[in-house]
């Protein structure tokens, strides 16, 4: 894979420093400006404070970029041009048309693996959408998690999804799901989902050993680490479900499908909750980035 590295990321790779990949769909499509830019900066700062180097991924004028300069991140955040939401399947088109866009979980997993970066932080992964038995809307993220040796840190799957079916598909794909200090799957805005987890890691060193065993010893694909969102900004699950049901009904009436569902959901949920979901999203992004930075350092130390 032909990647363009920022100078900071290139130096970190050459020096063997721990790195954490970041997706940018949340910047280009997921959050409003200027909250999206503030979130990107906060995540990068959390990673640096943990002792690792942030490596945001994006497609800039057809180039697959690992590590962004400030003007490039601002370009994605301001959205003054048409920005693609780039998943793995979209690489060829984005490159050939010299497009610019934010990367999803699947795209970031592939780019991180190609760059030799073993840890990636995001808000929540994609998965099986509600009503998938009718429209078969299933994210590429799960296939990427199964394929690429990257430790993905998240607050569970996005709330809009069918969480039980997403967990079943992760199991079918052979992706281990690890609860970080929890026995229950977090559900993005909420600390719980009612879905028990089989595996748990109570400290970063244990989490790092699991990743190293999977990547180095077994030569297998990714690991999913689920971190409960901060308690002070999390929302009750039943409250979130009521808003999701109403928002999805609105999306259906408006004919919103596929990639457009999640940005619509995030925007409408923020309106319905008076900004509570936006606050929760910003907090969990930074919280995940902090743990990912610690995990990257522990992974490097274990080597």
Curated annotation (Swiss-Prot):
Lineage, top ranks: Bacteria, Pseudomonadati, Myxococcota, Myxococcia, Myxococcales
Biological role stated in the UniProt entry: Catalyzes the reversible cleavage of pseudouridine 5'-phosphate (PsiMP) to ribose 5-phosphate and uracil. Functions biologically in the cleavage direction, as part of a pseudouridine degradation pathway.
Endpoints of the signal sequence: none
Organism of provenance: Myxococcus xanthus (strain DK1622)
UniProt similarity note: Belongs to the pseudouridine-5'-phosphate glycosidase family.
GO molecular function: hydrolase activity, acting on glycosyl bonds; metal ion binding; pseudouridylate synthase activity
Keyword annotations from UniProtKB, A to Z: Glycosidase, Hydrolase, Lyase, Manganese, Metal-binding
Gene Ontology CC terms: cytoplasm
One of the protein's GO biological processes: nucleobase catabolic process
Enzyme class: lyase
Gene3D superfamilies linked to this entry: Indigoidine synthase domain (3.40.1790.10)
Protein name (Swiss-Prot/TrEMBL): Pseudouridine-5'-phosphate glycosidase
């Amino acid at each position: 894979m032909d990647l363009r590295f920022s100078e900071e990321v290139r130096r970190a790779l050459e020096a063997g420093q721990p790195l954490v990949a970041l997706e940018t769909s949340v910047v280009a499509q997921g959050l409003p400006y200027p909250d999206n830019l503030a979130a990107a900066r906060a995540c990068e700062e959390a990673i640096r404070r943990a002792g690792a180097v942030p490596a945001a991924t994006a497609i800039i004028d057809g180039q697959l970029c690992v590590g962004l300069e400030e003007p490039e991140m601002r370009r994605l955040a301001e959205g003054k041009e048409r920005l693609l939401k780039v998943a793995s399947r979209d690489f060829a088109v984005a490159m050939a048309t010299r497009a610019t866009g934010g990367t999803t979980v699947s795209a970031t997993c592939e780019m991180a693996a190609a760059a030799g970066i073993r840890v990636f932080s995001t808000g929540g992964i994609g998965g099986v959408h509600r009503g998938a038995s009718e429209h078969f809307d299933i994210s590429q993220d799960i296939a990427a998690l199964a394929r690429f040796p990257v430790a993905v840190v998240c607050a569970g799957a996005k709330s809009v999804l069918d969480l039980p079916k997403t967990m079943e598909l992760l199991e079918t794909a052979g992706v281990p799901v690890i609860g970080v200090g929890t026995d229950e799957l977090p559900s993005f805005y909420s600390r719980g989902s009612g879905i028990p987890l089989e595996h748990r890691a109570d400290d970063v060193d244990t989490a790092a050993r699991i990743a190293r065993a999977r990547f180095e010893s077994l030569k297998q694909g990714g690991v999913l680490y689920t971190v409960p969102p901060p308690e002070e900004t999390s929302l009750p699950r039943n409250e979130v479900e009521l808003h999701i049901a109403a928002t999805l009904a609105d999306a259906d009436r408006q004919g919103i499908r596929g990639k457009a569902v999640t940005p619509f959901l995030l925007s409408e949920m923020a309106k319905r909750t008076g900004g509570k979901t936006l606050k929760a999203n910003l907090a969990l992004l930074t919280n995940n980035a902090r743990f990912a930075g610690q995990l990257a350092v522990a992974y490097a130390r274990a080597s």
